């Protein structure tokens, strides 16, 4: 799938973006490169390959760098709310803006 300059200008118009001709041509090149990459990926035969829920686990050197999500510091609510102009029952009070 290849886009034309008219397509890029129409998309910009629909997105309410003002785009100069030079920018539109540059964007056209980038989008066509992206769609070319997508076409290459779609051309790969993946029959018989089970999808991975978390593909990063298959790369050992990357997976080992990840750590468990654990609490590393304690947040003191009173200290954080002390500079607030208005607090009630541990909640910040803000002015009503919608009727």
UniProtKB/Swiss-Prot annotation:
Its EC number is 6.3.5.-. It holds the Pfam family GatC. One of its GO terms (biological process) is regulation of translational fidelity. Coiled coil: none annotated. Keywords: ATP-binding, Ligase, Nucleotide-binding, Protein biosynthesis. It catalyses: L-glutamyl-tRNA(Gln) + L-glutamine + ATP + H2O = L-glutaminyl-tRNA(Gln) + L-glutamate + ADP + phosphate + H(+); L-aspartyl-tRNA(Asn) + L-glutamine + ATP + H2O = L-asparaginyl-tRNA(Asn) + L-glutamate + ADP + phosphate + 2 H(+). InterPro entries: Asp/Glu-ADT_sf_sub_c (IPR036113), GatC (IPR003837). GO terms for molecular function: asparaginyl-tRNA synthase (glutamine-hydrolyzing) activity; ATP binding; glutaminyl-tRNA synthase (glutamine-hydrolyzing) activity. Belongs to the GatC family. PANTHER family: GLUTAMYL-TRNA(GLN) AMIDOTRANSFERASE SUBUNIT C, MITOCHONDRIAL. Heterotrimer of A, B and C subunits. HAMAP family: GatC. Allows the formation of correctly charged Asn-tRNA(Asn) or Gln-tRNA(Gln) through the transamidation of misacylated Asp-tRNA(Asn) or Glu-tRNA(Gln) in organisms which lack either or both of asparaginyl-tRNA or glutaminyl-tRNA synthetases. The reaction takes place in the presence of glutamine and ATP through an activated phospho-Asp-tRNA(Asn) or phospho-Glu-tRNA(Gln). This is Aspartyl/glutamyl-tRNA(Asn/Gln) amidotransferase subunit C. It comes from Burkholderia vietnamiensis (strain G4 / LMG 22486) (Burkholderia cepacia (strain R1808)).
């Amino acid at each position: 799938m290849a886009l034309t300059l008219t397509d890029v200008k129409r998309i910009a118009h629909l997105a309410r973006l003002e785009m100069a001709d030079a920018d539109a041509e540059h964007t056209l090149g980038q989008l066509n490169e992206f769609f070319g990459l997508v076409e290459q990926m779609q051309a790969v035969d993946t029959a018989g390959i089970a999808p991975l829920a978390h593909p990063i686990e298959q790369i050992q050197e990357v997976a080992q760098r990840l750590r468990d999500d654990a609490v590393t510091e304690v947040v003191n609510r009173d200290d954080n709310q002390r500079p607030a102009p208005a607090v009630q029952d541990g909640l910040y009070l803000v002015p009503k803006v919608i009727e």
